[in-house]
C-alpha cells in the first residue's frame, strides 16, 4: 500500500523535462537506452556498447563481444552475497561499500522475452546520452593512481552511499534526470515508482504488471 501511495503522489509531482536535452528535437539523432527491472528490488540501465564513448566505462572492456551493456549500482554485500534480513537491514541503514555491476548481452529481446524482466526503451538526445554516460563514469571509485578498482569481471568499486533513501532505483533515476528526462529521483526508492514515471515518457517493450 505504501508503494501505491507513493505512485499516486508522484503522478501529481513529477519534474518536467530539461528542454535543452529532452525530448530529442525532430530530425536529431537519438540514442536508445533501456530501463531494465529485475523484480521487486533492482533496476539497471542498458545501452549499446557502440554508443559508449571510448574509455568512459571500464566495464565496457569486460564484455567486448557483447552488443549491449547493462549496468547497475548498489550495496556491496547486498549485490555479492546471498541476501538476508541482516544484510538488507545493514544496507538500508547506510552503506558506503557500494559497487557497480555490468553485464553484457547481445539482443534486447533476450531481456524482453524473459519473464524475469520488465523493459522500457527511452530515446535520448546525443547531449542527454553524454550526460548519462558521465553520471555512470563518475560513479566509479578510483584508486590512488586514478584507476578504477576492479573486483572481478563486471564488478567495480563505486562511489556513493546506499541507504533506504538512496537505492539502486534512485541511482538509475538520477542518470535519467541528468539526461533531461521528466523524472523525480527522490520518489524512486523502489522499482514501482521508478517504472511508473518512466513509462510516461518511454516505451514499454514488455507489459508490466501494476506499475
What annotation goes with each model-predicted range?
Residues 19-39, 49-157:
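Non-catalytic ligand/cofactor/substrate-binding and regulatory segments of enzyme domains
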Residues 16, 138-211:
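Activation targets extended, charge/polar-rich intrinsically disordered C-terminal tails
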Residues 7-8:
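Residue-level signal for mature regions of secreted extracellular proteins and peptides
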Residues 43-46:
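Short beta-strand scaffold segments in enzyme catalytic cores
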Residues 1-4:
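Bacterial N-terminal signal peptides that target proteins for export
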Residues 11-13:
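C-terminal motif of bacterial Sec signal peptides marking the signal peptidase cleavage site
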Amino acid at each position: 500500500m505504501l508503494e501505491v501511495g507513493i505512485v499516486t503522489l508522484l503522478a501529481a509531482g513529477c519534474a518536467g523535462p530539461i528542454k535543452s536535452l529532452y525530448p530529442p528535437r525532430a530530425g536529431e539523432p537519438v540514442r536508445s537506452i533501456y530501463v531494465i527491472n529485475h523484480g521487486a528490488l533492482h533496476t539497471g540501465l542498458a545501452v549499446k556498447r557502440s554508443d559508449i564513448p571510448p574509455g568512459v566505462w571500464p566495464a565496457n572492456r569486460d564484455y567486448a563481444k557483447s552488443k549491449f551493456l547493462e549496468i547497475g549500482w548498489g550495496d556491496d554485500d547486498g549485490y555479492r552475497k546471498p541476501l538476508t534480513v541482516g544484510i538488507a537491514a545493514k544496507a538500508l541503514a547506510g552503506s558506503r561499500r557500494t559497487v557497480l555491476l555490468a553485464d553484457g548481452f547481445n539482443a534486447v529481446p533476450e531481456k524482453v522475452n524473459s519473464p524475469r524482466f520488465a523493459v522500457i526503451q527511452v530515446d535520448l538526445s546525443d547531449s542527454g546520452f553524454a550526460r548519462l554516460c558521465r553520471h555512470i563514469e563518475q560513479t566509479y571509485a578510483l584508486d590512488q593512481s586514478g584507476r578504477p578498482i576492479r573486483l572481478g569481471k563486471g564488478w567495480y568499486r563505486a562511489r556513493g552511499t546506499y541507504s533506504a533513501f538512496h537505492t539502486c532505483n534512485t541511482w538509475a533515476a538520477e542518470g535519467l534526470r541528468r539526461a533531461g528526462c521528466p523524472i523525480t529521483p527522490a520518489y524512486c526508492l523502489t522499482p514501482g515508482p521508478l517504472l511508473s514515471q518512466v513509462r510516461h515518457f518511454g516505451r514499454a517493450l514488455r507489459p508490466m504488471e501494476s506499475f
